[in-house]
Regions:
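Extended alpha-helical targeting/anchoring segments
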Residues: 1-340, 480
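Helix-start/capping segments and mature chain N-termini
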Residues: 177, 210, 214, 315-410, ...
Length: 559
């Protein structure tokens, strides 16, 4: 929309207007229901599906190397006197699991902001957690509060206060903020009565769940309240363009890798007396639902930062990623866990053995848990993980006399969203040489991203295993909605073809097991689509295998 309001900024869709998305939507209502926060939450909850809901950490569409090259161009333009600052942005691909309405509630509760918005339309949804006011009108008074300057939060209070004070004292951030204040004073002058534009405050620090933000406030008395005058004068907000505004917009149009869409636009409302509009940052725009999955949606989150002459490209890239951390801030209500095999050594050898000799696949479990924690926003400390495993070993040794003759144990470590670790263990009894399998009656949603992680949200698996055990079987095999074989409730499935093992690819919808990863890395297994017929034939011919890190690879057959 900014390009359409400013004739000197080229329209990216010029010559092919059929591809241009709508520049905006306006809805007019005869009446509106004004809800309290609790009423709004209850309204949304009543429409949300009862599923775990959250976000997987976004995947950057712009590499650090390409970003650095873009920053070099911006700094050259600043050196040439073409611009003073550019707010350079780029998109992240984001995957949601669960209902978008529940995701929005979780995000809003974890990071309350004054200008959040949830838009639910048949063809798309918007989850905006914007903390930034574009403008607010009350009678003939208008207020703007640009946001420019970011620093991360700290866990401890003293460190967090130090971060806030450092941001407030930062000459670089104050200079950027003041540059945008001057720009918005100029914009307000277009619609304000002469002499009424006032800077109410400078360099305020606002704390949010993952970041501190620097803001300033400016107000004025309007000479008009018409949106048809306010929008052309003020849009887009200077905090997300740079300065000079038009020159910065021209550079943005030429250098950014994709149109911004709603990101850095505005979402607002208007009545006869009042208007309020946000700057649509921290805003996730979901792709249209495909109808293939109720458990997963994809979307785009824009991130960016203001670039000036002394900006450090690596630091700016890190700041952009930091601004996306709010997506994984809420506790999703489940734990991540790993189930490890512990082989208790002889007491006289115990003190000399490394952890990997006691927990044979320790490294694979640690790697998978660390990766899952990063993707889903869980706190994870590798030293803490190692420490609790040593504690469990000591506990089992202490109680070993009550388990005479048992040398192998099942150890489960649960990781909470806040990084806390809990352990449980039990003896690991032997199994038959060939294990029996049944078919699970439920189908897996192969698009559900949570299937790729080992979480406590696994009632579907637990129920299938319970049925299998009742039928004297080890496990139940699941298929996805397309009828392709995925995995067992507690094992990965393999079919032996000559000297090679075939196992379903992760895209079918399954947990990438630790044993499975080992076999793939060693070249002993490869991914291949498997059908029910493939499994039946392998069972008849003695080529069917299932396996996990706890039990290893086991011959199997269908009951």
């Amino acid at each position: 929309m900014g390009a359409l309001l400013e004739a000197t900024v080229e329209n990216r869709y010029a010559g092919d207007e059929t591809k241009q998305p709508p520049i905006g939507y306006i809805w007019v209502f005869n009446e509106a229901a004004w809800l309290t926060q609790a009423q709004a939450d209850a309204w949304l909850l009543a429409r949300a599906a009862d599923l775990p809901a959250g976000c997987v950490r976004g995947c950057a569409e712009l590499s650090p190397e390409t970003y650095i090259k873009k920053i070099v161009k911006i700094r050259q333009a600043i050196a040439d006197g073409e611009i003073y600052q550019v707010n350079y942005t780029w998109p992240l691909d984001v995957t949601l699991y669960g209902d978008p309405a529940q995701v929005f509630i979780n995000l809003a509760q974890a990071q309350p902001t004054a200008y959040a918005a949830y838009i639910d339309m048949p063809e798309y949804q918007v989850l905006s957690l914007s903390p930034e006011l574009f403008f607010a009108v009350d009678g003939d008074r208008i207020k703007v509060r640009p946001m420019k300057g970011t620093s991360p939060r700290c866990v401890d209070h003293e460190g967090d206060q130090a971060q806030a004070q450092a941001l407030k004292a930062s000459e670089k951030n104050r200079a950027e903020n003041l540059m945008i204040v001057d720009l918005l004073r100029n914009d307000l002058g277009r619609v304000a009565k002469p002499g009424t534009v006032i800077v109410d405050s400078l360099f305020d620090i606002e704390a949010y769940a993952t970041v501190h933000q620097m803001t300033s406030s400016i107000s004025a008395t309007l000479n008009t309240r018409r949106l048809t005058a306010l929008i052309p004068a003020l849009f887009p907000c200077g905090s997300i363009t740079g300065a000079p505004k038009v020159a910065a917009m021209q550079k943005i149009n030429a250098w950014e890798i994709a149109p911004r869409g709603l990101y850095t636009g505005t979402i607002g409302w208007a009545t006869a007396e009042k208007i309020q509009a946000n700057v649509a940052i921290r805003t996730l725009v979901l792709d249209p639902p495909t109808g293939e999955s109720l458990a997963a949606r994809t979307g785009i989150l824009g991130v960016g930062s203001g670039i000036v002459w002394d900006s450090n490209a690596e630091a700016e890239y890190a700041e952009c990623l930091l601004k996306s951390d709010f997506l994984v801030k809420p506790d999703p209500g489940f734990t991540l866990f790993e189930t490890l095999r512990l082989d208790l050594p002889a007491a006289e050898l115990e003190a000399t053995l490394p952890l990997v000799e006691i927990y044979p696949r320790y490294r694979g479990h640690r790697s998978r848990l660390s990766a899952a924690a990063f993707s889903l926003g869980f706190g994870f400390n590798e030293e803490g993980f190692e420490s609790i495993l040593w504690q469990v070993k000591a506990e089992i040794r202490e109680k070993a006399p009550g388990n005479a003759g048992i040398k192998s144990y099942r150890v489960r470590i649960d990781l909470g969203h806040d990084g806390t670790l809990h352990s449980s263990w039990s003896a690991l009894p032997p199994l038959a040489d060939r294990v029996a399998l049944i078919w699970a009656t439920e189908r897996l949603d192969g698009f559900n991203p949570l299937l790729r992680y080992k979480t406590s949200a696994r009632s579907l698996y637990d129920a299938a295993i319970e049925i299998a055990v009742a039928q004297q079987a080890f496990d139940a095999l699941f298929c996805n909605q397309a009828g392709l074989v995925c995995e067992g409730g507690r094992s990965n499935v393999f079919v032996k073809e000559g000297n090679r093992l075939l196992t379903p690819p992760v895209r079918c919808g399954l947990l990438p097991g630790v044993l499975r990863a080992e076999l793939l890395a060693r070249g002993e297994a490869s991914e291949s689509l498997l059908t029910i017929s493939d499994i039946k034939a392998a069972s008849r011919e003695g080529r069917l295998r299932v396996g996990n890190a706890l039990r290893g690879l086991m011959p199997a057959y269908l009951k």
